[in-house]
UniProtKB/Swiss-Prot annotation:
Membrane topology classification: Multi-pass membrane protein
SUPFAM superfamilies, alphabetized: Cytochrome c oxidase subunit I-like
Single Gene Ontology BP annotation: respiratory electron transport chain
Binding site for Mg(2+): H373, D374
Keywords in alphabetical order: Calcium, Copper, Electron transport, Heme, Iron, Magnesium, Membrane, Metal-binding, Mitochondrion, Mitochondrion inner membrane, Respiratory chain, Translocase, Transmembrane, Transmembrane helix, Transport
Enzyme nomenclature, EC number: 7.1.1.9
Cofactor note as given: Binds 2 heme A groups non-covalently per subunit. Binds a copper B center.
Protein's name according to its UniProt entry: Cytochrome c oxidase subunit 1
Pathway(s) the chain acts in: Energy metabolism; oxidative phosphorylation
Major localization class: mitochondrion
Name of the top EC class for this enzyme: translocase
Organism ancestry: Eukaryota, Fungi, Dikarya, Ascomycota, Saccharomycotina
Crosslinked residue numbers (1'-histidyl-3'-tyrosine (His-Tyr)): H246-Y250
Length: 535
């Protein structure tokens, strides 16, 4: 293919599948940088006395800020919503493409300058050491006088605008592009998950944009929205930020719920238990996500009755979440379970996400949250939900659908090695953090008393294991793309190809009840030029 055609295909692409591939590549690139930054954090905390950054606390704060923003905005969201959402949602609905194809293109390309801005913000002057929450007055002009915070805020603006355009696209596609005969109750769970994610993005992102814009004005135009001296209030920023932030954590995990539902159905060889209950549970989680934002703010001095309300409302979210957990377990019960790597990641997700949810119930209590606030207990909680929830669902989705997407099989044995290294690594990293938090170790501080050294060293060891697991995954994908046997010529190739690591033929072919399994492998660029008809 000529250079001109390549540029037309990949730079000016209006095809959802090509854009999804771009999202996957972008997410992998961002994840590699974000993982490198997490390695710096764990090297710094591997011992007392700031062994890696030599006491440069600002540099440490810049690293944790960049790590969080990269992992959330440039890894998990592009992979789950941009990658799997763009590729699978039109296929599951029987649509030829997304509703707004060119809007889809700009949604992706806005992320590239956004990533450049956030990386630049970490490199100019002293960097943006605000934490990813960008709290004022720490993010104000007195504390961060250079352009770093402005660059970080513009990065979040661009990323948010990209997500907003994508959300409009997904909602329109879901409502208008379903194929003939596909009623709402026939829509697969992953497509529902992407719809709810898009609705949450649409309702929450404008509020974040407002808060960040006020921050830009405070920094550069002498307003005082968050400045006490001028009659402003820094707590207002927290309300605006967390109004977006709490739905955001569900934006990160709800597409994962959709993927796990499909994976559990695949490995148990039976339909998901209680599909309508699953849909209502996701809707309830999304709706309740807007009613609990101040549980992040128990330590700022809320009234006791306000704290009582937010404690109760937060605990209510455990109900629809547990409906999902028990429905997955009920799906597995009595099924013919195939313990392939998709199954391992799905079961790992259910187990570890449940642990993260239980620590969330602990933190929902305002009386308990005040001592736990900003301690490593909170870090352990949200990493169990994200590092082992969202990220495990991404791996699970890759191992479930990549043979269909690429038409190439991955090496089953290597992928098992990836799972076990990852499972051990993340648990060894984050489980000790519960103990550190209970002992009172504060987060975002780059040194600590000698009493905390034991569990910190264990956590740093775990992070090394996780990094090795990530390298193994990159090799699995490389091996899949170079040695993965095409489904078309699979029968012709010798089943006993001599290879130390085994053959890529161990993968069991899976076909499911949803429309994406009915098209060719790999799917053509416009899989449904003629609408599929469901009876």
């Amino acid at each position: 293919m000529s250079l001109k055609l390549n540029i037309q295909r990949w730079l000016f692409s209006t095809n959802a599948k090509d854009i999804a591939v771009l999202y996957f590549i972008f997410a992998l690139f961002s994840a590699m940088i974000g993982t490198g930054l997490s390695a710096i954090i764990r090297l710094e905390l591997a011992n007392t006395g700031s062994p890696f950054l030599h006491g440069n606390t600002q540099a440490f704060n810049v690293v944790i800020t960049a790590h969080a923003i990269l992992m959330i905005f440039f890894f998990v969201m592009p992979a789950l919503v941009g990658g799997f959402g763009n590729y699978l949602m039109p296929l599951m609905l029987g649509a030829s493409d997304m509703a707004f194809a060119r809007l889809n293109n700009i949604s992706f390309w806005l992320l590239v300058p956004s990533l450049i801005l956030i990386l630049t913000s970490a490199l100019v002057e002293a960097g943006a050491g605000t934490g990813w929450t960008v709290y004022f007055p720490l993010a104000g002009i007195q504390s961060h006088s250079g352009p770093a915070v402005d660059l970080a805020i513009f990065s979040l603006h661009l990323s948010g605008f990209s997500s907003l355009l994508g959300a409009i696209n997904f909602i329109t596609t879901f409502i208008n592009m379903r194929t003939i005969g596909m009623k709402y109750e026939n829509v697969p769970l992953f497509a529902w998950a992407v719809l709810f994610t898009a609705i949450l993005l649409l309702l929450s992102l404008p509020v974040l944009a407002a808060g960040l814009t006020m921050g830009i004005f405070d920094r550069n135009f002498n307003t005082s929205f968050f400045e006490y001296a001028g009659g402003g209030d820094a707590v207002l920023y927290q309300h605006l930020f967390y109004w977006w932030n709490h739905p955001e954590v569900y934006i990160l995990i709800i597409p994962g719920f959709g993927i796990i539902s499909h994976a559990v159905s695949a490995i148990a060889s039976k339909p998901v238990f209680g599909v309508q209950g699953m849909i209502y549970a996701m809707w309830s989680i999304g709706l309740l996500g807007f009613c609990v934002w101040s549980h992040h703010m128990f330590a700022v001095g809320l009234d006791s009755d306000t704290r009582a309300y937010f404690t109760s409302a937060t605990m209510v979210i455990a109900v629809p979440t547990s409906i999902k957990i028990f429905s997955w377990l009920a799906t597995l019960y009595g099924g013919t379970i195939r313990l392939n790597v998709t199954a391992l990641f799905a079961l790992g997700f259910i187990f570890l996400f449940t642990i993260g949810g239980l620590t969330g119930v602990v933190l929902a209590n305002s009386a308990l949250d005040i001592p736990f606030h900003d301690s490593y207990y909170v870090v352990a909680h949200f990493h169990y939900v994200l590092s082992m929830g969202a990220v495990f669902s991404i791996f699970c989705g890759w191992y479930l659908w990549s043979p269909k997407i690429l038409g190439l099989h991955y090496n089953e044995r290597l992928s098992h090695i990836h799972f076990w290294l990852m499972f051990i690594g993340v648990n060894v990293t984050f489980f000790p953090m519960h103990f550190l938090g209970l002992q009172g170790m504060p987060r975002r501080i780059n040194d600590y008393p000698d009493a905390f050294i034991g569990w910190n060293q264990v956590a740093s060891l775990g992070s090394i294991i996780s990094i090795v697991a990530s390298i193994v995954f990159i090799y699995v994908v490389y091996d899949q793309l170079t040695n993965g046997l095409h489904q078309g010529n699979k029968a012709l190739d010798s089943q006993f190809k001599p290879s130390f690591m085994g053959t890529n033929l161990n993968v069991e072919g899976y076909t499911g009840p949803t429309l994406e399994w009915t098209v060719s492998t790999p799917p053509s660029l416009h899989a449904f030029n003629t609408p599929a008809v469901l009876y």
